[in-house]
Amino acid sequence: SASESASASASERASERAPTSGPGGDRGARTTAGPTTHRLRNIVLMGMGEPLHNYDAVMHAIDILRDDAGLSIAAERITLSTVGVVPGILRLAQEMRPLHLAVSLHAATQAERAALVPAAKKWPLDELMAACRTYSETTGRRIFYEWTLIEGKNDSADHARAVGQLLQGLPAQVNLIPLNPTSGYDGTPTRSEAAKNFQ
């Protein structure tokens, strides 16, 4: 199975993004809906197009979210998710942006990843992992690696061992995600027993 250091539940990941102390850690936006005031704790930039394809606008939006005149969200509460846009990851490292980075990994070999993630054909796995290593070494931050479990595609014990080896030595956590079936993809969600064995 994947190494313990490279696995985390969604709740653990959320906890990692939401420190209760430290610089800015007690800040959080508040939104009002009717008579109830809600504290906005975390923001994840995901599912709205590839954030790193629109780097400058996304960073400007993050700056507004963080500003006291905006939503006053601490940077440690913001996660940016990418399919693996290598130039953007390297730019994040260069600019030392204090946010959390999540990478859609889903496979530990180039052939398997290219079959699941079209962007892997432009930015191969070895280039992606080199960029991730640079990011972690430069910023000192761990990366969250997203792994959507798909029956028969990436959910075997061999796949678990492969991702453990791929991430060995990196400050990493793997977030296992159940596949959400859609009409545009014929993959099947991993069965619960296989998911437990993968962990």
Residue ranges of model-derived segments:
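Conserved AdoMet/S-adenosylmethionine-binding subsite of the radical SAM
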Residues: P35-F198
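Intrinsically disordered, low-complexity terminal tails and inter-domain linkers enriched
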Residues: A2-T37
